[in-house]
Structures are given as structure tokens and as C-alpha cells.
Curated annotation (Swiss-Prot):
<feature type="compositionally biased region" description="Acidic residues">
    <location>
        <begin position="1202"/>
        <end position="1223"/>
    </location>
</feature>
<dbReference type="GO" id="GO:0006351">
    <property type="term" value="P:DNA-templated transcription"/>
</dbReference>
<comment type="function">
    <text>DNA-dependent RNA polymerase catalyzes the transcription of DNA into RNA using the four ribonucleoside triphosphates as substrates.</text>
</comment>
<dbReference type="GO" id="GO:0032549">
    <property type="term" value="F:ribonucleoside binding"/>
</dbReference>
<comment type="similarity">
    <text>Belongs to the RNA polymerase beta chain family.</text>
</comment>
<dbReference type="InterPro" id="IPR019462">
    <property type="entry name" value="DNA-dir_RNA_pol_bsu_external_1"/>
</dbReference>
<dbReference type="InterPro" id="IPR007121">
    <property type="entry name" value="RNA_pol_bsu_CS"/>
</dbReference>
<dbReference type="GO" id="GO:0003899">
    <property type="term" value="F:DNA-directed RNA polymerase activity"/>
</dbReference>
<dbReference type="InterPro" id="IPR007642">
    <property type="entry name" value="RNA_pol_Rpb2_2"/>
</dbReference>
<dbReference type="InterPro" id="IPR042107">
    <property type="entry name" value="DNA-dir_RNA_pol_bsu_ext_1_sf"/>
</dbReference>
<dbReference type="Pfam" id="PF04563">
    <property type="entry name" value="RNA_pol_Rpb2_1"/>
</dbReference>
<comment type="subunit">
    <text>The RNAP catalytic core consists of 2 alpha, 1 beta, 1 beta' and 1 omega subunit. When a sigma factor is associated with the core the holoenzyme is formed, which can initiate transcription.</text>
</comment>
<keyword id="KW-0808">Transferase</keyword>
<dbReference type="InterPro" id="IPR007645">
    <property type="entry name" value="RNA_pol_Rpb2_3"/>
</dbReference>
<feature type="region of interest" description="Disordered">
    <location>
        <begin position="1171"/>
        <end position="1246"/>
    </location>
</feature>
<dbReference type="GO" id="GO:0003677">
    <property type="term" value="F:DNA binding"/>
</dbReference>
<dbReference type="Pfam" id="PF10385">
    <property type="entry name" value="RNA_pol_Rpb2_45"/>
</dbReference>
Length: 1246
């Protein structure tokens, strides 16, 4: 039975059976924690890596001592958006310069540029635009082995050693058992050459090192080198072909390639993966010892020959400092296993070393040396601190290389295992912090070069740290990262869910990641290790499928960047599932048996069933005895992401449709009247609260004052908290951001309560759409092919009305002929057009504007022409006033209208920062109410999308027996083949819940079932089947069969017909071909392609065809004359020669072919090169043929993205035939014909 649960201010009836033992984490914590780590530790790491910088003589030393970020940025978040500024704080670094000769030390605080700050909601504001840094999924550094088969079916093994940065090492075996190695992607050579270069010079040394394996012998036979020196030279020749090889240069090359921390970096995660993969313990575990193994310090026998080594003994052997053990293989051969000599420091030191942060395994030879040299605790601690870099080296060691080669040999004897690179144990996340750190490191290393150069040039006695440091490269690399990296994205702000999901997105694309073209099926596929870490459902359809994913709802990121999922621990002694939570990474999870969250437990927490369905080791699924289970899931929704967890009855939907449902919820536009879903999943409150669009109380207290734009809360200590609310602001996507209070004066609130709603929220819950009364039936074919029939009532009541705000800007610049001026005094414009402009020429707030209306009056000086005597006289009498200017006012673009809601004016005089050459900048915001319309796209939450085909009067809609008309009629044929049955269950339960006055929570995989719904229907007085009798609104007669009717949550999506519909009579033309441009953004025409031409040819419609190919397209003279004839009412003249024909001739002539055009009787036809002069005059007479008769420019600064704006500059001015155009001045860019090109743009205001 459903039970009430309190979610914020609302109570929902929940059908959940499972007690949640763990609250969901903060959903944007992954962004915030990563950035905080960067500020606290990431920056320090980079400075420590680069410091100290020495000059080439070793005399001057520059050290970075400390850094601080000023907590008071120049502009706050709101101001930064308004002024197109970056929300950033100055980074100051304390730098010390030491002169070794004189012993002089200079310290200075150096400003290192403004550093972008993260807002409270996990975003950055760069140049006034809100951006998100998406986390990147990359292959983790480590050692990877894989297995292939040759033609004869023989197993061949290969391995790759991948660092975080530095040279790769690759091993492979061939059919003849020869093991070869590639160093840094060069040609391959026998692996023994590398071993010789590392100092194992003779054949005997190599055999002693790795044992007498047949692979070793085969490789030695292939190897032409015989000594360490020859090995070095051989490797040098491969890496530096063409350079004279010497022993010194070869030795230094090997050292810088692998053993220099500046060139080769494993990072923390790489060292962790190396120690895990190559550790002795993991490899000898569960094999039989082939000899007695004794502790080298005490001589105690740890394991006897023939005994099977278990986990405990294997760790004991490893931690005692033993690095080589012989074990028996499956075929009872003696196999030598070599580890990489890393041990757990806690087994050797009994005092507390917490503060040294030596959490990982350490290199045993160094540790042994320290323990043998020092005795007292203090000395050992000091030595450990000093030699931390040697204990946990960042670069690869000889022992790592030897162990990795040995591992490859052991694989042939079934010792060790091969890796799956798509396993989430081998893929890690680079989140904001690390991406920024890498970028900062690039900037600092560029700066280091400059510093070294300046050290040599400048006077040693007078030099200061400030004079040495050039911050340009650092500032540039940060700016470049935020401004143009693939992972820095313009935030999707359509609604709160879109915002939240964007911050939790994981992308495998980007620098250092995959590319769409190269990514195969395997990378994109759902993997068993995704469980509880990455959502198997939410991913885009199309070329990015499986490359862009979403973090699961309970997942978190550990210090190494691996995704962890929480589980409840099972107490094996008492066989009780405890409430203790443990977070496991994907490779840890593979070793355990884990029960599902919906497994029944009794009061004490014991399993109800003797046999339990579980996920077994390495991704299998099986039914196991209850006493074998190690862990249990915390919640059924830990598998899926936030958006997917908001689909009720997800378990009854086909995965493909659930994917569409998850993605379409992100495209829902915020409605004017919000309405939380009747059938929710209980996720709505948490998602809204964490998305950052609602206002959350910082402290407890009593509400003191409430207005539409401010809430004041009085705290216990008499202090007051003020909360400013956002009113009608424009989001990145042009939707409307508006907050409204949901508390009243005198109300008591607690810290963390939601006190004001934002867009698409209803009393603190996400409300993306509206609950509509839906019937599934065919109606006169109007819902054929997923079309949707809606009731006119939805239009009248503004139920699906949305507000959209567009931004237009106009700037007055300095031109060669003088400055542009924003003014009301515009030539040749009637008073009627200026009625809404104020005295400075800017439109007033509240004015209603239509397409073509002037928003900002602006004039630009015209080129000086040779003046006639009369004009010179006038100029002499009236002064400069008579100088010619032309009208370049900002007008409302074609097809747009609305009400002016805001105006912002920035001028140099007021001290506003403007780009160079700009004197004044005006921004105008136009708001428009868009009612639901035929052609708009709507969808439910189950991937059931459709387009509105007809809006029917209320009286014609089918109605229930009590007279209630349906609001929406859907096609029942949309359900069976799509297999999204969740929508049907939602409709039935919605009907019952509405009647009972409930709001329901039915969590995913743990919600209401068929019988619960039938019970609810019965309780509310409806038949258990849920089908009702309907009558036809037109005739009043009952339909033959009862119909499924109920409440479904419907969303209005961002694909609105008003933004897509487009028409043109005349407009801009491409400069070279003189054909109309394409796409709505360019005010282009409809392409009449070759297939359409064939259709007209087939009909023999010769005149229509000729007209389309000439005067309607690129017959320049003809189209001007045609236009003139239409205006004057004369007959249309004969078409001329299309421009594209002339272009073809020119192209052939450029290929040195003399092309002539002949008539039937072999006379040469003269094809004019330019447009004849009368065409030019005509064009001026008839105000360049455009929509309307004004100058045909796409209005300046209309709501365009940056990319479009660049294009626009070409077209709006040059691509039109205007008076200047008879001498073309610049080359135009060809345009994408399809408007979709401009649909998903990243519109970053540069």
C-alpha cells in the first residue's frame, strides 16, 4: 500500500517498498569538489613540479613559495553576466629569487593573471556566458595486457605500458615466440635489447633475471646485440635515426625518456595502477609454491613447497620484501614470478606516519635503506619525508619494466590475467580540477622557458622576480581552455534538469580522448562495470552514442579519478546486511558477490530467501546461497542517472524509448504556469534543489519580509539574511529565468529549505510539463504517425504557454570616415517609425515591436564623394550638418516580434569596459509569449513524442460521461511497437491519483505494480480495467469501445514551429555564384536540387523550370528586371545567362582552356563579365530587392551566436547586391543549406 512521504513542502504517496539506507549525495558535488581540490592542492602540485627554475649556469634560482586567490572578484556573478566580463579573481604568487654567487635573496608577490572562479552552482562565467566544464573519460595510465590468436590458433600476448605523459612501451610476441618491444611508437626490436640497455648486458644476466623460458631463448637468438653498450646504441639508432650514436647520448636519452620525472609522469593514479597490476601478491595468489619461501629478515619460512598460496600469505610474502617467487603452472612447470618491489609501509613501521601522506605502497629498496641507516622514530620520519619522491616515484623504474616483461611471459602459463580496456576499472575521469591543472602546467612550462631566457639576458644584480616572470603564456593557456576547449561547453540552460545533467556529463571525446570517427562499437557499448557508475540509458542518439554518458545517481569519484558506487556490507559472521556503506571501484567490485537492492530482508536484516539473485565475480549473474553474498546494492536507482530516475515505471519501458525520454526531458521549455507531475518518482525535489535554480535558505529563522524580488529572513541572533530573486532573465537558450517566493511572512524555515521557486519548479519540485487528461484513440486520422490532437482549452488557459527572451545588440564603432552615432535623427525615416524611441534613439521598455521596427537608431558616415558646386555651397553655409550618413539602425529581424522588457546601455563615458573601437553598446531584450501551436513538438516522459496536428475546439473533443472533455488525444498505435508500456501505467495511476487528490511517488524499479494500480482505480471509484466510456463531442454519440483515459505528464519541447518556419521572396545572394544563400539564419531560399529539377523535367514544365533556374536564382540582370516588371505591372522579360554558367567558363579558362559560346549558326556569343550599369541603377531605384523595400541586411547583432555572427558579417553586407557590391570587396563564405547546422551551436560570446 502507498504511504505518505514528505518531500520539501509536498507530501507524496510513495509505492516504494525499500528503505533507503543512504541519502543521495549532492548532485553537483563532482564539479565543486574537483575545483576545490584544484585550488587547494592542484595548483600547489604544479608549482612544486616546476619550481625551482635555474638558469643555465646554476647561479640564479627562482622558487614559487606560496600562492593566494583574492576572494573579492572585481565583478560578482550577476555583474559579470551583465557586462560580458569573466567572473574571476586575481591569482597572486609569492616568488623567491636566490643569487648563489652573492647569497642575495629577493622575495616578491607577483600577479599571475585573473583566474576564473566557479559559481555556487558549479559553472563558470566566461565573457558573460555561463559555461560548464564537462568531465572527460580517458584510459587510465597503467600496464595493459591482451591476448590474440594467430592463424594456427596459438595464443599471442601483447602489452602496453601507458604513462600519464611520456613515452609508451609496447611488447608483443609473434608466432615464433620472439618477444619484441616498441619504445615510443618506433620500430620494434627484440625485448632483450631493452633489457641490455637497462644494464642487464650479457645473455647470462638476462637468463638469470627472467629464467630459462623458451620465449627468452627465442628472443636472445633473434637479438644481434650481445652487450649493454650495443643494446644502448641499438635503441638510440631506432629512436634518433640519422644521428651519430654514442654511449653517452644513448644513456642520457634512455634516462630522460623513462627516468626523468619532468619528461615521464605516471601521476598518482599510474603508480597506483602499476603497483596493483604488477604486485607479486596478486599474481602468486591461488597458485602452488614451487619452493620454500622464507622471510629475508628473520629467515622464518612463510610458505612451504607445494602449498597453495592464499591472499594473506601472498601479502605477507610481498610485504617482507621478497620480489621473486617460483610457483607451479597448470602444467606443473616451475615458473618464475617477479614483482615490482613495492610494499605496504605499515608492515615495516609501527609508529604513526599519517601526516606524511604515504598512503600508497612504497619502493622497498629505498625503504630498506632508510630503516637500515636510521634508528630513532624522528630520524626515520625525517628521512621518509625527504625521500618521498623516491619512495613513491612519479616515473617508471627498472623493476617496473622487468616486472611488466615477466608478467607477459607468465600469461602464457595462465599466471596473471588479460585486461579489458572498456572496463571502468581501466577508464578514469579527468574532472575540472585535473583538466585545469594540466592546462595550467602547459602555461607554466611555456613561462619557464621565458624565465630561463631572461635570466641569461638580464643584469644579475638588478634582476627582480617580477622582471623575470611573463604571465602572458599562463593567462593565455587558461583563457584558451575556458574559451575554446572541446570540454568547455556553453551551458544547456533550457530547464533545471538540463543544467544539472550537463554538469554530471561524462565525455570520452576531447583532447587526449577518442574521436567520433575512430571510436568503435566496443567503447560505446554498455559494460557490466557501468552498473551503479554510469547510466546505461542516458546517452545521445546519433554519432555520439555511448561516447557521452551521464554519471549514475549515487556514484562518486575517488582520488584517483575512478568512479565508485556505494554498497551495503554484509556481516558474514551473523549473515546480516548492515547499514554500513562501502564505496567500491569497478575492479574492486569484480572480486565480490553483490545482491540487488530489492532482495527481501527480514527485520534483523537477514536475507528472506535461501538463494539470492546476485551479480557474481567479473560481471556474471547467478543465483547463489545467501551466505556467499558479500555486499548489497543501496538503492534500485543507483544504476541510472538523475534524468532517467525521473521516468516513472521505467522498468516497463523499452530501453530505446527510455533513452529518448531521458533526453527529451532536458528539452522541455519552462511553462508559464508550472505544474508538478501527479505521477512522480520522488526524485523531483532533490533534482530541483541541487540544480541551483531554486533559492535555498542558508540559515534557519523566521521570514521577515517577502516581495516578488526579495526575501528577508530574520535569524535567531537578530541578524538578517537577504535573498535577491532573479526576475525575467534570459537563459543561455533564450528561455525565461524567473524566481518567485513560496514562503509567507512569519513562516518558520530551516536551513536547507527551498524558499523560492525557479523556472520549471513547483513548490520546490521539478515541474517540466503539465498533467493533461489524455485518451488513447484514433480521431479522424489527425493522430496518424504520432501526431497529437489537442484541446483549444490548453491554448486559452495558457496551460502550455512559454516565455522566450531574445537579446539584440547594436554597437557604435569608430569607422575610417568618422564615428557611428546612436541617435533619433535618422535620414528618410518617418516620425511613425520613431514613435517608441526615446530622445537618445533607443526604444522604450514596454513597447510592442513587430518585424522591421527600429530598436536602436544608428547612423554611419558615408564615403565622401566628389561634391558638385551647389553641394559645396550648401556645405559652406550649413557646415558639417549636411554630411551624408546612412541608416544602420538595429531592427527587429524578419519573423520576430514581442515586448521590450529590458535595455542596457554601456558607454565609454560611464567608465564601462568596451572592446577597442566601440564607443557605445546598446542591448535590447525582447520577450515573447509563445502559446502552443500546430507544429510544436510535445512528448511524454517515456519517449512518446509527437507533433501537434490540430487544435480542436473544446466542444468537439471527445468527452467523459460526466462531460469532461479530453485535453489530448493520442494514437494507441504508438504504444505496442514502441514497447513503452510505462505511459499506459502512468495514465491509469494518474486517473486514480487525480480522483483521490494524491501526488504519487513511484520510484524506478521499486514502484507501483499492475495490481497496486488496479487497487487505486477501485479505491477512486473507477473500473479496475481503467477504461472509460467516451462520447463524440461533435455528435454526442458514445464511441463503440471503452477508451483508456487518464492523466499523463506532457512536456512542450524546445523545437517550436515559430523558430523553424521561414519564408523569403528576395534576400541575400552568395557573392561568387550569385545564388541565394540557404538556411533561416541567413534568410536564405529553398534549394531546388537536381532531383527536383528531374521532377519538373519529367512533367515537361519548361517555363517553370527556366524561371527557377534563372530569374529566381542567379541570373543577376534578369532578376533585377523581373522585379522591376512586377512592380510596374509589365510583362516579364526573357531570362538571361545564369551567373553559375559564367563561373564555369571562368573556371575552365583558369585551366587554360579557351572556351567560347557559339550560337546555332556558329556566331560567337558575347557574355558580359559584369552586371551592366542600368541593372545597377535599377537596383538602387528599387531599394535592393529584399523582403520589404528596405536595405536587405540581416539586422545587425540580432540573436546570433558567434559563429553565425562571423558569417553574418560576410553576408549581411557583402552577399547582397547593394550599391557597394558592384565592386565586390571580400570573399564570401558558402553556407550550410540546412538550418539544423545552426541548431546545436555552442554560442560563446567571444
Amino acid at each position: 500500500m502507498p504511504h505518505p512521504v514528505q518531500l520539501g513542502k509536498k507530501v507524496r504517496m510513495s509505492y516504494s517498498q525499500i528503505n533507503e539506507v543512504l541519502d543521495m549525495p549532492n548532485l553537483i558535488e563532482l564539479q565543486k569538489e574537483a575545483y576545490d581540490w584544484f585550488l587547494d592542492e592542484g595548483l600547489r602540485e604544479v608549482f612544486n613540479d616546476i619550481s625551482p627554475i635555474q638558469d643555465y649556469t646554476g647561479n640564479l634560482i627562482l622558487e614559487f613559495v606560496d600562492y593566494s586567490l583574492d576572494e573579492n572578484p572585481k565583478y560578482d556573478v550577476g555583474e559579470s553576466k551583465e557586462r560580458d566580463a569573466t567572473y574571476a579573481a586575481p591569482l597572486k604568487v609569492k616568488v623567491r629569487l636566490i643569487n648563489k654567487e652573492t647569497g642575495e635573496v629577493k622575495e616578491q608577490e607577483v600577479f599571475m593573471g585573473d583566474f576564473p572562479l566557479m559559481t555556487d552552482t558549479g559553472t563558470f562565467i566566461i565573457n558573460g556566458a555561463e559555461r560548464v566544464i564537462v568531465s572527460q573519460l580517458v584510459r587510465s595510465p597503467g600496464v595493459y595486457y591482451n591476448r590474440q590468436f594467430d592463424k594456427t590458433g596459438k595464443q599471442l600476448y601483447s602489452a602496453t605500458v601507458i604513462p600519464n605523459r611520456g613515452a609508451w612501451l609496447e611488447y608483443e610476441t609473434d608466432s615464433n615466440d620472439v618477444v619484441s618491444v616498441r619504445v615510443d611508437r618506433t620500430r620494434k626490436q627484440p625485448a632483450t635489447v631493452l633489457l641490455r640497455a637497462l644494464g642487464y648486458g650479457t645473455d647470462q644476466q638476462i637468463k638469470d633475471l627472467l629464467g630459462e623460458d623458451e620465449r627468452i631463448l627465442a628472443t636472445l637468438e633473434k637479438d644481434n646485440t650481445k652487450t649493454a653498450e650495443e643494446g644502448l646504441l641499438e635503441i638510440y639508432k631506432k629512436l634518433r635515426p640519422g644521428e651519430p650514436p654514442t654511449i653517452e647520448s644513448a644513456t642520457s636519452l634512455i634516462n630522460t625518456l623513462f627516468f626523468d620525472a619532468k619528461r615521464y609522469d605516471l601521476a598518482k593514479v599510474g603508480r597506483y595502477k602499476f603497483s596493483k597490476k604488477l604486485s607479486l601478491a596478486n599474481r602468486i595468489m591461488s597458485h602452488k609454491a614451487a619452493e620454500n619461501v622464507s622471510d629475508p629478515q628473520t629467515g622464518e619460512i612463510l610458505v612451504e613447497e607445494g602449498t597453495k598460496i592464499d591472499r594473506e600469505i601472498s601479502l605477507l610474502i610481498q610485504n617482507s620484501g621478497i620480489n621473486e617467487v617460483h610457483v607451479y603452472s597448470e602444467e606443473n612447470k616451475k615458473i618464475k614470478v617477479i614483482g615490482n618491489h613495492f610494499v605496504d609501509i605499515k608492515t615495516h613501521i609501527d609508529f604513526d606516519i599519517q601526516d606524511l601522506k604515504l598512503r600508497e605502497r612504497v619502493y622497498y629498496p629505498v625503504l630498506r635503506e632508510i630503516l637500515d641507516t636510521f634508528d630513532s622514530e624522528a630520524e626515520i620520519k625525517e628521512a621518509l619525508k625527504e625521500r618521498k619522491r623516491e619512495l613513491i616515484p612519479k616515473h617508471i623504474l627498472k623493476s617496473d619494466i622487468v616486472a611488466s616483461i615477466n608478467y607477459a611471459f607468465n600469461l602464457a602459463h595462465e599466471i596473471g590475467n588479460v585486461d579489458d580496456i572498456d572496463h571502468l576499472g581501466n577508464r578514469r575521469l579527468r574532472s575540472v580540477g585535473e583538466l585545469l591543472q594540466n592546462q595550467f602546467r602547459i602555461g607554466l612550462s611555456r613561462m619557464e622557458r621565458v624565465v630561463k631566457e631572461r635570466m641569461t639576458i638580464q643584469d644579475v644584480d638588478l634582476v627582480t622576480p617580477q622582471a623575470l616572470i611573463n604571465i602572458r603564456p599562463v593567462a593565455a593557456s587558461i583563457k584558451e581552455f575556458f574559451g575554446s576547449s572541446q570540454l568547455s561547453q556553453f551551458m544547456d540552460q533550457t530547464n533545471p534538469l538540463a543544467e544539472l545533467t550537463h554538469k554530471r556529463r561524462l565525455s570520452a571525446l576531447g583532447p587526449g580522448g577518442l574521436s567520433r570517427e575512430r571510436a568503435g562499437f566496443e567503447v560505446r557499448d554498455v559494460h557490466h562495470s557501468h552498473y551503479g557508475r554510469m547510466c546505461p540509458i542516458e546517452t545521445p542518439e546519433g554519432p555520439n552514442i555511448g561516447l557521452i554518458n551521464s554519471l549514475s545517481s549515487y556514484a562518486r569519484i575517488n582520488e584517483y579519478g575512478f568512479i565508485e558506487s556505494p554498497y551495503r556490507k554484509v556481516d558474514k559472521k551473523r549473515d546480516v546486511v548492515t547499514t554500513d556503506i562501502e564505496y567500491l571501484t569497478a575492479d574492486e567490485e569484480d572480486l565480490f558477490i553483490i545482491a540487488q537492492a530489492n532482495e527481501p530482508l527480514d527485520e534483523e536484516g537477514k536475507f528472506g530467501n535461501k538463494r539470492v539473485t546476485s551479480r557474481t565475480k567479473f560481471g556474471g549473474i547467478d543465483v547463489v546461497p545467501f551466505d556467499e553474498v558479500d555486499y548489497m546494492d543501496v538503492s534500485p536507482k543507483q544504476v541510472v542517472s538523475v534524468a532517467t530516475a525521473m521516468i516513472p515505471f521505467l522498468e516497463n519501458d523499452d530501453a530505446n524509448r527510455a533513452l529518448m525520454g531521458s533526453n527529451m526531458q532536458r528539452q522541455a521549455v519552462p511553462l508559464l504556469i508550472t505544474d508538478a507531475p501527479i505521477i512522480g518518482t520522488g526524485m523531483e525535489y532533490k533534482a530541483a534543489k541541487d540544480s541551483g535554480v531554486v533559492v535555498v535558505a542558508r540559515n534557519s529563522g523566521i521570514v521577515d519580509y517577502v516581495a516578488s524580488n526579495e526575501i528577508v529572513v530574520k535569524l535567531e541572533d537578530g541578524q538578517k539574511d537577504r535573498y535577491k530573486l532573479l526576475k525575467f532573465k534570459r537563459s543561455n537558450q533564450g528561455t525565461c529565468i524567473n524566481q518567485k517566493p513560496i514562503v509567507s511572512k512569519g513562516e518558520r524555515i530551516e536551513a536547507g529549505d527551498v524558499i523560492a521557486d525557479g523556472p520549471s519548479t513547483d513548490r520546490g519540485e521539478i515541474a517540466l510539463g503539465r498533467n493533461c487528461l489524455v485518451g488513447f484513440m484514433a480521431w479522424e486520422g489527425y493522430n496518424f504517425e504520432d501526431a497529437i490532437l489537442i484541446n483549444e482549452k490548453l491554448v486559452k488557459e495558457d496551460a502550455l504557454t512559454t516565455i522566450h527572451i531574445e537579446e539584440y545588440e547594436s554597437e557604435a564603432r569608430d569607422t575610417k570616415l568618422g564615428p557611428e552615432e546612436i541617435t533619433r535623427d535618422i535620414p528618410n525615416v518617418g516620425e511613425d517609425s520613431l514613435k517608441d524611441l526615446d530622445e537618445r534613439g533607443v526604444i522604450r521598455i514596454g513597447a510592442e515591436v513587430e518585424s522591421g521596427d527600429i530598436l536602436v537608431g544608428k547612423v554611419t558616415p558615408k564615403g565622401e564623394t566628389e561634391l558638385t558646386a551647389e553641394e559645396r555651397l550648401l556645405r559652406a553655409i550649413f557646415g558639417e550638418k549636411a554630411r551624408e550618413v546612412r541608416d544602420t539602425s538595429l531592427k527587429v529581424p524578419h519573423g520576430e516580434n514581442g515586448i521590450i522588457v529590458d535595455i542596457k546601455v554601456f558607454t565609454r563615458e560611464n567608465g564601462d569596459e568596451l572592446p577597442p573601437g566601440v564607443n557605445e553598446l546598446v542591448r535590447v531584450y525582447i520577450a515573447k509569449k509563445k502559446k502552443i501551436n500546430v507544429g510544436d513538438k510535445m512528448a511524454g516522459r517515456h519517449g512518446n513524442k509527437g507533433v501537434i496536428s490540430r487544435i480542436l475546439p473544446q466542444e468537439d473533443m471527445p468527452f467523459l460521461e460526466d462531460g469532461t472533455p479530453l485535453e489530448i488525444v493520442l494514437n494507441p498505435l504508438g504504444v505496442p511497437s514502441r514497447m513503452n508500456i510505462g505511459q499506459i501505467l502512468e495514465v491509469h495511476l494518474g486517473l486514480a491519483a487525480k480522483a483521490l487528490g494524491w501526488k504519487v511517488a513511484t520510484p524506478v524499479f521499486d514502484g507501483a505494480n499492475e495490481f497496486d494500480i488496479m487497487d487505486a482505480l477501485e479505491e477512486s471509484g473507477y473500473p479496475r480495467g481503467g477504461k472509460l466510456k467516451l462520447q463524440d463531442g461533435r455528435t454526442g454519440e458514445a464511441f463503440d469501445n471503452p477508451v483508456t483515459v487518464g492523466y499523463m505528464y506532457m512536456l512542450k519541447l524546445h523545437h517550436l514551429v515559430d523558430d523553424k518556419i521561414h519564408a523569403r521572396s528576395t534576400g541575400p545572394y552568395s557573392l561568387v555564384t550569385q545564388q541565394p544563400l540557404g538556411g533561416k539564419a541567413q534568410f536564405g531560399g529553398q534549394r531546388f536540387g537536381e532531383m527536383e529539377v528531374w521532377a519538373l523535367e519529367a512533367y515537361g514544365a519548361a517555363h517553370t523550370l527556366q524561371e527557377i533556374l534563372t530569374v529566381k536564382s542567379d541570373d543577376v540582370v534578369g532578376r533585377v528586371k523581373t522585379y522591376e516588371c512586377i512592380v510596374k505591372g509589365e510583362n516579364i522579360p526573357e531570362p538571361g545567362v545564369p551567373e553559375s554558367f559564367k563561373v564555369l567558363i571562368k573556371e575552365l579558362q583558369s585551366l587554360c582552356l579557351d572556351v567560347k559560346v557559339l550560337t546555332d549558326d556558329d556566331h560567337e556569343l558575347e557574355i558580359k563579365e559584369t552586371i551592366d550599369d542600368d541593372a545597377g541603377e535599377m537596383s538602387l531605384e528599387h531599394g535592393d530587392f529584399d523582403y520589404g523595400l528596405e536595405e536587405p541586411t540581416v539586422p545587425e547583432g540580432s540573436h546570433i551566436t558567434d559563429e553565425e555572427e562571423k558569417d553574418e558579417d560576410n553576408d549581411s553586407e557583402e552577399a547582397l547586391i547593394t550599391e557597394e557590391d558592384f565592386e565586390p570587396t571580400s570573399v564570401e563564405t558558402e553556407y550550410a543549406e540546412d538550418d539544423d547546422e545552426f541548431d546545436g551551436y555552442n554560442d560563446f560570446k567571444a
